[in-house]
Amino acid sequence: MITGNIIKIAGPVIIGDGMRGTQIHEMVRVGDIGLIGEIIELEGDTATVQVYEETAGIKPGEKIESTGGPLSVELGPGILKSIYDGIQRPLDEIKSVSGDFIPRGIDVPALDKVKEWEFKPTASVGDKVNGGDIIGTVDETSAIVHKIMIPPKMSGTIKSIVSQGKYNVTEDIAEVETENGIETVQMMQVWPVRVGRPYTNKLDPDVPLITGQRAQDTFFCVAKGGTSAMPGPFGSGKTVTQQQLAKWADADIVVYIGCGERGNEMTEVLTEFPELEDPKTGNPLMDRTVLIANTSNMPVAAREACVYTGITIAEYFRDMGYDVALMADSTSRWAEAMRELSGRLEEMPGEEGYPAYLASRLAQFYERAGRVTTIGSHKAEASVTVVGAVSPPGGDLSEPVTQNTLRIAKVFWALDASLADRRHFPSINWLNSYSLYVDSITNWWNSQIGSDWRDLRNTAMALLQKESELNEIVQLVGPDALPQKDRVTLESARMLREDFLQQNAFDDTDTYCSPSKQYNMLKTILLYNTTAQSALADGADINKLVNLDVRVDLGKMKYIPEDEFEAKVEDIRNRITKECNEAGQ
């Protein structure tokens, strides 16, 4: 252990001397009260440390002690259902120790070292094992089986393994004979957060992450292992949209990072998720969720660490063979933390004061997403999907964080303040948003849901584009001056907007819409468009066509429960054909 002294303090940045022999990214304890920090710069025997806690009251001359290891997370049974701060300190444990406020320098282990878990071995003495091989399981929650793996860099032969029973996370459960002698395996692994966990190879992102949200799934889909950016100004619905994805996405595990956002938003998640049922298992959603809360009133430097903490936990569950969805809300606050630290370090600023390395740091984070073949003999296909919210000041999408994120992310959900003001939620602007995964996941939709899915999607997008062009004319001369076929187009596009794209997150039925229901809703609305256009060509009255009785039922389609939907939608389609034919007589 190396001990130095503080010589300079600048907010969350501290400079100390006598630190020769330490390494970049090594964890240190700063001051007499032992604040947690990380070395970010070394020059001679002088070290620059970013401190993850409030530095008020620390003075020059106090000690800095190295810990000998990098900023790392503890990975093992007990992670699920937990709420951590940005450096993986369990907030519920801190509350039981110190009350409602987090004292500085508190040292609480991330995983409970006393609690015992029921371990069931799946490997035997004499088995050859490599990094990533599963040697046993623990039923961590009612929804998730926690698979105990050999650490990534270990390989050899199992010399001994414990029998089924209760053990804590630090007890030795197996001994492996390696080239370097006998090494022990515990249920807990420790992994540095800035180093990605290994995998065998990356796979094509050709399976969609079904979210149950019509705008995202049908029009701007994200693939499992994909990256998505969600920029939007204040009040445009970023947090509710992220929470909807966390609730209903068909991932096995959800890691939700509240990075520099309001504490009330994390409170919402904490109060709602235990009450909500997972549609796949019927268990509370909290059973498959990890929360990392680094709210706006917590120290700025810890924001820089919290996204790495979150993605490392996500990669750990990916290695077990699970599909993981990671929500980062919001990456702008993380970038602002980098800007502040860069300013304290007196580095040359880039655009708008952000550091010149902003783009590479964002890329390092997003590139840890992906659908992969895991290491180990089980060779499972698993994924980490990253959805990053971006909060550009004033909704200005030309600012550096948004622009650099767009270069990396393959899906762009542009949240629009004007749509939010009109109470159109989710306020995803269908003209500005895009997905680069549509080509790769078309086969899945066509084979699993409907062979004409891509054609329907393209037709609907063309209708919405046409409506945008016609609206410019309507604002000048009014809708009555338009050709009759364009009035039907406007009406069909309005139904797409109001009856398909709008979705009520607080309605028990509409909050989640299955892929087959989405497909049938879209098909029915487009059936109205084609049938009405053909009836119009046969001489039907335009006023009758835009005021059909079935229009009311089309608007209520989204509120039909899944088990009744198929029969009712067939009836609606028959009525569309019948009423359009009657309008032409």
Swiss-Prot record:
Subcellular location: Cell membrane
Protein keywords: ATP synthesis, ATP-binding, Cell membrane, Hydrogen ion transport, Ion transport, Membrane, Nucleotide-binding, Translocase, Transport
Entry keyword annotation includes Cell inner membrane: no
Pfam families for the chain: ATP-synt_ab, ATP-synt_ab_N, ATP-synt_ab_Xtn, ATP-synt_VA_C
Residue numbers binding ATP: G232, P233, F234, G235, S236, G237, K238, T239
Membrane topology summary: Peripheral membrane protein
Catalytic activity: ATP + H2O + 4 H(+)(in) = ADP + phosphate + 5 H(+)(out)
Enzyme Commission number(s) of this protein: 7.1.2.2
Gene Ontology, cellular component aspect: plasma membrane; proton-transporting two-sector ATPase complex, catalytic domain
PROSITE patterns the record matches: ATPASE_ALPHA_BETA (PS00152)
Function: Component of the A-type ATP synthase that produces ATP from ADP in the presence of a proton gradient across the membrane. The A chain is the catalytic subunit.
PANTHER family assigned to the protein according to its UniProt record, in alphabetical order: H(+)-TRANSPORTING TWO-SECTOR ATPASE (PTHR43607:SF1), V-TYPE PROTON ATPASE CATALYTIC SUBUNIT A (PTHR43607)
Entry's family note: Belongs to the ATPase alpha/beta chains family.
Identification of the protein by name: A-type ATP synthase subunit A
